[in-house]
Amino acid sequence: MKKVNLVLGVSALAILVGCDSGSDYTPAADASGEQIFSTACSECHKPLSADVAMIISEGMANKDAIINKVHSGSMRMTAFPNIQGDAADRLAEYVLANSATQ
């Protein structure tokens, strides 16, 4: 029983350590939405095909929702608070233009 508790404790700690509160990534002023996505997002959001970057829900299929998610992150997604202004707009436009809606 002690071994099970130890394994569970170590597993929980590993999961918590993996949860990052935010990234300090700041895109170049002239970075395209695709470049920002490739650098900041594609490590977790692998493109599904040549023309589909990811699948998003209908509730996320708008620019404001995407930008809010990028800034705040979630339990499973790192926040990117330094993707601001025009760069955030370009990223959101890229995601919308290259995603399928579920």
Where on the chain are the PLM-derived regions?
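Gly/Gly-Pro-rich "capping" loops immediately C-terminal to redox-active cysteine motifs
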Residues: A28-S38, E43-T78
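C-terminal capping alpha-helices of c-type cytochrome domains
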Residues: P81-Q102
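Bacterial N-terminal signal peptides that target proteins for export
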Residues: M1-V7
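Alpha-helix boundary/capping residues
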Residues: S11, A40, G73, V95-N98
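Bacterial signal peptide processing site
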Residues: D20-G22
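C-terminal motif of bacterial Sec signal peptides marking the signal peptidase cleavage site
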Residues: I15-G18
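Sec-dependent N-terminal signal peptides
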Residues: V7-L13
